[in-house]
């Protein structure tokens, strides 16, 4: 799937998306694995190095035959119907809560909604309130994440 749809322009979007995730993680004081900007610019994306070793990369100028499966055949698949209204939408909400701009993440929500002709964010039940963390301050959320101490509304 990634190997057939990936090109330098899409890799740039992925890298910028990752930068927004890193900014959000920093604001929330949580750690993330290290992914370098250059790691996105491979036919195997950042996952090539993760699964095949730190020196593994396939430049866009080279053909790579080692892809499995054909990927989805339409837009009604989990890469959109789950990743966007759950992952992207929650990151967008956390960005608003923490004052972190998420224009790339927000654009993913808008583009996916436009392609599917429905509002994926409005349809999503996955809000910070649904997770019962919307009311928490930064300090309370830290206590919950690090110590498991939940502060109810």
Q: What is each residue range found by the language model?
A:
Residues 1:
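A conserved mid-domain beta-alpha-beta active-site/ligand-binding segment of alpha/beta enzyme cores
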């Amino acid at each position: 799937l990634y190997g057939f749809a990936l090109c330098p322009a899409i890799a740039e979007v992925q890298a910028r998306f990752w930068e927004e995730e890193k900014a959000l993680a920093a604001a929330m004081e949580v750690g993330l694995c290290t992914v370098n900007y250059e790691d996105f610019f491979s036919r195997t994306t950042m996952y090539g190095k993760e699964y095949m070793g730190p020196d593994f990369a396939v430049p866009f100028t080279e053909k790579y035959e080692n892809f499995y499966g054909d990927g989805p055949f339409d837009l009604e698949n989990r890469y959109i119907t789950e990743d966007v209204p759950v992952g992207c939408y929650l990151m967008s909400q956390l960005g608003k809560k923490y004052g972190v701009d998420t224009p790339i993440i927000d654009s993913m929500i808008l583009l996916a909604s436009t392609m599917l002709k429905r509002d994926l964010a409005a349809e999503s039940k996955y809000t910070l309130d649904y997770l019962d963390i919307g009311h928490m301050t930064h300090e309370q959320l830290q206590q919950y994440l690090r110590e498991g101490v939940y502060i109810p509304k």
